[in-house]
């Protein structure tokens, strides 16, 4: 069991470094998919096969493939990106050091007084399935954080739609209020065209 744990953990670390250090964006996404697959392996070792399946279906099957298609469709100029990074190398290094120091501080000092065996923790038994156990915890002890997470995702989705929704000139749109306000008098027009001359252009209000 420990051999597989160290194997998956090592592969996740290597693939994560390759995601950051790879010069090709497509290769970075492929390494990211490989990291997700190894993460699913760790979930299986923990006995959470449902989470492993969700990690494969959602992250690999949807998110990572979406990233891959977007990167392949966009014209990515890596040399230009490297030039921009070199211009801000000092600032980027300073921010990276601050974040690294923050993570080390949280790991060393932030978890010192935390009791990981709380009232919420429970022992997985064979009486209920893994999916039922996760659902029971999510909708009882963690109901409020779970609903808040869904609300945050909903707000983010609405914000993305609002930012990308632009009114373009020259494009015809339906005005439902104006269409419903029409009646027989301003929709039906009776004409008596002259023979072999046709009807002139009619402008509707």
UniProtKB/Swiss-Prot annotation:
Gene3D superfamilies for this protein: NADH-ubiquinone/plastoquinone oxidoreductase chain 6, subunit NuoJ
Transmembrane stretches, start-end: 1-21, 26-46, 54-74, 89-109, 142-162
Topology versus the membrane: Multi-pass membrane protein
The keyword NAD belongs to this UniProt entry's keyword annotation: yes
Compartment list: Cell membrane
One annotated Gene Ontology cellular component of this protein: plasma membrane
Record-listed E.C. numbers: 7.1.1.-
Coarse class of the protein's main subcellular location: membrane
Reactions catalysed, as given in the entry: a quinone + NADH + 5 H(+)(in) = a quinol + NAD(+) + 4 H(+)(out)
Keywords for the protein's UniProt record, in alphabetical order: Cell membrane, Membrane, NAD, Quinone, Translocase, Transmembrane, Transmembrane helix
Class of the enzyme per the UniProt entry, highest EC level: translocase
NCBIfam families (alphabetical): PRK06638.1-4 (NF005164)
Function: NDH-1 shuttles electrons from NADH, via FMN and iron-sulfur (Fe-S) centers, to quinones in the respiratory chain. Couples the redox reaction to proton translocation (for every two electrons transferred, four hydrogen ions are translocated across the cytoplasmic membrane), and thus conserves the redox energy in a proton gradient.
The protein's name: NADH-quinone oxidoreductase subunit J
Species this chain originates from: Rickettsia felis (strain ATCC VR-1525 / URRWXCal2)
